[in-house]
Regions:
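Catalytic Walker B motif of ABC-type/P-loop ATPase nucleotide-binding domains
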Residues: 159-162
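Helix N-cap at the start of a conserved alpha-helix in ABC-type nucleotide-binding domains
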Residues: 170-172
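ABC ATPase NBD coupling module
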Residues: 12, 66-82, 111, 185
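Conserved ABC transporter NBD signature motif
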Residues: 57-65
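Conserved ABC ATPase signature
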Residues: 134-138, 142-144
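Helix-to-loop junction immediately C-terminal to a conserved catalytic motif
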Residues: 49
Length: 220
């Protein structure tokens, strides 16, 4: 489902975000992407979402070569992706329900269908009772769970969660991770990046480690 073949990302003559990375992530797999800040985790995630293109090598997602995909094809690729970032980027002038409905509305879904699916997504993360609340009325952990609901409302094949538990207390972090693991259990491919050792210590899935843009331990 996700394949990197000798992928490098070079920003200047001697500045590499990724260097000769090769890995495979199978359909339905849960993978933790570990490493300190600046290790290249976010760059790897951005390549899967076609936000970044490789300087060399090949990135393939669902059979599509990210380096060759045309700009017009990127929205179609992303319809199969659920993207979750450390900073939720919720719209403060919309309710929680409105935020979760938005990905469906922008693709032309009828409002009634979008609302029904958004309510179902909020129910899955335990926030249906806060549907009418505004983002600033929620805690950081609750806002991150809204971001999870928004990411899964379009029923993606792949969830990319970039540091989803950063700056959360342990209880809030655990609830976010529990939600992501539940989606994985339902068959969704999940890639979760983190530098939190507590998250990794409790991980029962494969861990891919990056340091200075390179895989630790070789190809995976």
């Amino acid at each position: 489902m996700i394949e990197f073949q000798s992928v490098s990302k070079q920003y200047s003559h001697d500045a590499y975000a990724l260097r000769e990375v090769s890995l495979n992530i199978a359909k339905g797999e849960l993978v933790y992407l570990a490493g300190p800040s600046g290790a290249g985790k976010s760059t790897l995630m951005k390549m899967v979402a076609a936000v970044e293109r490789p300087s060399s090598g090949v990135v393939t997602v669902n059979g599509q070569d990210i380096g060759r995909i045309k700009k017009a094809g990127i929205p179609f690729l992303r319809r199969n992706l659920g993207l979750i970032f450390q900073h939720q980027r919720l719209l403060n002038d919309r309710s929680i329900l409105g935020n979760v409905m938005l990905p469906l509305l922008v693709t032309g879904a009828p409002k009634t269908q979008a609302e029904g699916r958004a309510r179902a997504a909020l129910d899955k993360v335990g926030l249906l009772d806060r549907a009418k609340a505004m983002p600033l009325e929620l805690s950081g952990g609750e806002q991150q769970r809204v971001a999870v609901a928004r990411a899964i409302v379009n029923r993606p094949q792949i969830i990319l969660a970039d540091e989803p538990t950063a700056n959360l207390d342990r209880a809030a972090a655990d609830r976010v991770l529990d939600a992501l693991r539940a989606f994985h259990a339902a068959g969704v491919t999940c890639v979760i990046s983190t530098h939190d050792d507590q998250v990794l210590d409790s991980a029962s899935a494969r861990v891919i480690r990056l340091e200075h843009g390179q895989l630790v331990g070789g190809a995976v």
